[in-house]
Amino acid sequence: MTDVEQPVSVEDQQAQAQSYYDQVLGNAYVQTAINAYTKTKEFHPLLNSTLNSAEEKVSTVGNYAAQKAYDGYNSYYVKPKNTAYEAVSYGTERAKTAVESGKQAAIVGGTFGIGAAVVLTQFSLALSAGGAALVLEQVDSAKKLGSSAISTIKEAELAVEHRIFSALHQAQRIAMVPVEKITENTNSLLDILDGAVQKGLNIEVPPSVNLTIGQRVKNLASLIVQGVSNKLFKAHDHVIDPINERARNYLEQLSQSFVLLDIVREKKTWVIEKSNELSTSVFDFKKTLEEEAQKYKVAPEEMLMKHIQSTSEQLSTQLQSLREKGQNVFGDGTKIDSTIDYLENLKKNFTDAEDVYKVRDEVLNEGRQRIAELSTWTTSLLIISAEWQFEPEDLLIEELYFDAPPPVRTRNLYRNRA
C-alpha cells in the first residue's frame, strides 16, 4: 500500500509559504515580472487605482508578486499532487499499483510524485475550461462549416490526445525519468490519469489490459470528450447562458451610455433632437434617460452619470455570479476579477467627476477599450476562456514552480504510441 502524505499544521504551512516567497522573489523570472509590473504602472497611471487595490491586500508589490506566485504553486502543484493521492485512494487497484510500480520504476527522492503532479497539472486542461474550449471550438467550427458531428468529435479527440502526450512528456522531462523506464513510467502516469478522469468526470474508465500507450491515450481522449461535452452543455444551459445574457444586456447599455456621453461632451450640451450621429438604439436609450430625468426632476446629464454608475455595478454583480457559479467550467477567474476591479474603479471615477463634462479623457478612452474587449469576450465566453488556462511554455513551470535540474538527453516518448 502506498503511503499517503499526512496533513501539515498551519505553522508548517506558513513556514512553507514564507520559504516559497523567498525562493520566488529571488527568481530572475519573477524579478523580470515585477519590473514589468512596475513599469506598467508608471506608464499607465490610470491603472494605478486598480493595481494598488490589489496590492493593499498583501501590502507591497513584492509580496503581491509572491502571493500570486504562491497561488500558482497551490493551483499548479499542491492541488494536482493532492488530486493524485485522491485518485490513488479512489478505489481502483490499478492506480494503487501505479504508484507502487512508479516508485520502483522511477524513482529516487519522490520524483514520481512530482511527475504525477505535473502530468495532472498540465492535463487538467482537458478536465476544465481548456478541455471545454477544445470541444466547443470544434463544435462551433463544425456549425459554421456544416461539418458532420462525427468529424467534429474526432477532431476534438485528437486535440485532447495531443494534450495528454504533451502532459506526459512535460512530466517525465521534469522528473528526469531514465530512458529505460519511459514506457513503465508512462503507463503508471496513465493509470493515475484514469483514476483522475473517473473521479473528476464521474465516468467509468475500463481497465487498460494489454493495450499499447497509443491505444490507452486514444481511449482516454474519447472518454474525456464525452464527459466534458456533457459537463459543458449542462453548465451552459442552466448556469452560464442565463447569466451571460444578463451581463451582455448591461454591457450593451454601458456601450450606449458611452456613445451618448461622447456626443454630449463634444457638443457641450444635451442632444435634444435625433441626430445622424445616433443609431436608433442609442436614440431610444436617450429618450428613456430623458423620461427618467423628468420623472426624478434632474438634468438628463446627471441621469446619464447615474446610469453609468448603476450599470457598472450591475454588470460587476453578474460577472461575480458568473465567476462563482461557473468556476467548475472556467477554472481560474483572474480575468473576471480584473474586470470587476475595473468596473468598481469606473464607478468611482464617475462619482468623483461630479458631471459628464468633468470626466477625464483617459477614463473614457480606457472605458471604450474595455467595453470592446468585454463584448468580444462575452460573445464567445468559453472559447475565450481557453486563453486563461496555462500551457507549459506560458508557466515556465520548471523555472518558476520547481527547482528542476537541467534537462537530460532528449528522449523519444512518441515512439511508444504504436
Swiss-Prot record:
UniProt superkingdom: Eukaryota
Location(s) in or outside the cell: Lipid droplet
Region called Required for lipid droplet localization, residue ranges: 211-275
InterPro entries: Perilipin (IPR004279)
UniProtKB keywords: Lipid droplet
A biological-process GO annotation: embryo development ending in birth or egg hatching
Summary of the tissues where the protein is detected: Expressed in intestinal and epidermal cells. Expressed in the muscle and hypodermis.
Coiled coil: none
Disruption phenotype: Viable, and able to reproduce normally, but embryos contain large lipid droplets. Reduced body fat accumulation. Lipid droplets cluster in intestinal cells and contain a reduced amount of triglycerides. RNAi-mediated knockdown results in a reduced brood size.
Record-linked Pfam families: Perilipin
GO cellular component: lipid droplet
Biological function: Lipid droplet-associated protein which plays a role in lipid droplet clustering.
Assigned protein family: Belongs to the perilipin family.
Protein name: Perilipin-1 homolog
Organism of provenance: Caenorhabditis elegans
Gene field: plin-1
